[in-house]
Amino acid sequence: MNFENLLIEIGTEELPPKSLRKLAESFLANFTEELTKAELSFESAVWHAAPRRLAICINQLALAQADKVVEKRGPAVAQAFDADGNPTKAAMGWARGNGITVEQAERLKTDKGEWLLHQARVVGVETKSLIADMAQRSLDKLPIPKPMRWGSNTTQFIRPVHTVTMLLGSEVVDGELLGIKSDRIIRGHRFMGESSFKLDHADNYLVALKEKGKVLADYEARKAIIKTDAEAAAAKIGGVADLEDDLLEEVTSLVEWPVVLTASFEEKFLDVPAEALVYTMKGDQKYFPVFDNAGQLLPNFIFVTNIESKDPQQIIAGNEKVVRPRLADAEFFFETDKKDTLEARLTSLETVVFQKQLGTIKQRVERISAMAGYIATSIDANSEEAARAGLLSKSDLMTNMVMEFTDLQGTMGMHYARLNGETEAVAVALSEQYKPKFSGDTVPTAPISICVALAEKLDTLVGIFGIGQAPKGAADPFALRRAAIGVLRICLENNLPLDLVDLIAKAQELHGENLTNADVAEQVLEFFMARFRAWYQDQGVSVDVILAVLARRPTAPADFESRIKAVAHFRTLEQASALAAANKRVSNILAKVEGELPAAIDDKLLVEAAEKALAEKLAELQPQLAPLFAAANYQEALALLASLRESVDTFFEDVMVMADDEALKNNRLALLSSLREQFLHAADISLLQ
């Protein structure tokens, strides 16, 4: 079989930078899926992407499908011929449909009978005749939320398309994509190199585009150049570039021919909190800030231009001119904001509604303050500082800086709190109240920060559930799932002695008559239980382990964690499988019992040796188990219970639980109930698979 390399490039207008990688990856994934469906073999496949192009390269693609033999079974021989041995209409119709006569058919014998059979040889289709349709289907499945039309064309795509290049080796693949006929034309850089050129062979795509078109189509290579050159540029001025990957990806998606340059700004701007300057440089201008080795912001930034200039200083001066007014705005906001303290801004919070039924932001911070103080008493934190931090937690929302740069909420609160003479613990708590902000973000660890972060999230959760606006489906406008996971993570990662039932009840009490949902406490608790499951599944914990713990509904996150670890460990023990099965059997037996069982086991009614042995073993373990369960040492407790495996197995082998004698039966049920009760102190082991 012959093979050749395939190139497909879609030349467009500037593509959305934040979507570029995803579009290219999806295009490749969709197309390779099409190849697999078409039974076309290939060695490897890669994607390339630049601001004005999406491309995929398939290496060593088979030039045709392999020929194959398809077995087509006909009617059973008994129905294929009549009593005289002549073909029936069914047999002749089947044969005609397969282009043969009945006499030419083979026979297939199986244990269920004998059938007519035709082994049809199917000749593989040439690859080049399939490519265009496969490519179009691949493009149709791209994740494009808002496709657009252009000109008089009815075709839709994420951006207008100007060229389509499909080359199988040196041959142009005939066909049309997105209303554009395939050709070998490749467009180069807008301002450098050849504006367009003809590509002679798919193998030469990257090299020709680089040398003729001045475009680096290899996304990863372009990203690596930017990273390496930016690091070198920062080192040259004695600093370290802040090359956050999201911004690095975005910049990579904005340029075809990256040139890294270094610029500066006036040192006076360094009096403004660094976060505000960094936000301006990264968010608005797509610049990389530079820090010294001590983590202090330097009056420099690194940027990437899309052109090689004979006078780079002119480009540097232009970028410095652009960023200066933005930094000056930040300086003005900061100086203006300093004129009022955070406490003085509390009054203005009365004018801002948090949620119509839940009152103003001022009422919200009063609740957060009380809640934070309440939590502080449970974790040995300073309740006055916690309450103070809660009260000031939203004051920075009324500052010019946060109104202009909303992502700086909390951060600017910290800076203003320090300027106002608040304690460092209070200041840091204002900054950390929204943590964790995203998956993988760190959680607060300082006591006052913990109190405020929990209070802030609980106020939102209980409030929104309390007015009947719980998340439905994928919609979660108040980010309640993130808030709930945040509460759980803060409690778990700090091993806090807090119970969700108490926290929910306190938050409900503080909301008072605002809440109209009578079931708010139970609904919020159930919401937390669902988040427990989601969180632990993300951590790789087996679902059956999670369900075993959830069955007991432990409401203290730290306690939930201890049980999860204990059950996960128990599951690895040799005895686990047998004891899980025994617990399931016991559970099923007890579920069918009507009426109450004896409160205690009557030793006089223990007749069989196996039931005596189990009762003795259980009685021997109970004094050891009680303190372990009291101390939430579930792992050691379950390890002790694992020693019951032999006694339990023997019991079920030798003892008839549902004896005819009512007293014996009830005593045995009481024994099994006592056994199950010990396991249930930790989890429902019967749910383990």
Swiss-Prot record:
Specify the protein name.
Answer: Glycine--tRNA ligase beta subunit
Any single Pfam family the record assigns to this protein: DALR_1
Q: Which family does it belong to?
A: Belongs to the class-II aminoacyl-tRNA synthetase family.
- Output the superkingdom of the source species: Bacteria
Q: Please list the reactions this protein catalyses.
A: tRNA(Gly) + glycine + ATP = glycyl-tRNA(Gly) + AMP + diphosphate
| PANTHER family named in the record | GLYCINE--TRNA LIGASE, CHLOROPLASTIC_MITOCHONDRIAL 2, GLYCYL-TRNA SYNTHETASE
Assembly behavior = Tetramer of two alpha and two beta subunits.
Single biological process term from Gene Ontology: arginyl-tRNA aminoacylation
Q: Which UniProt keywords apply?
A: Aminoacyl-tRNA synthetase, ATP-binding, Cytoplasm, Ligase, Nucleotide-binding, Protein biosynthesis
Natural source organism: Shewanella pealeana (strain ATCC 700345 / ANG-SQ1)
According to the UniProt entry, the coiled-coil residues are: none
One molecular function GO term is: ATP binding
Q: Which HAMAP family match?
A: Gly_tRNA_synth_beta
Stated EC number for the protein is 6.1.1.14
Residues making up the signal peptide according to the UniProt record: none
Q: Where in the cell is it found?
A: Cytoplasm
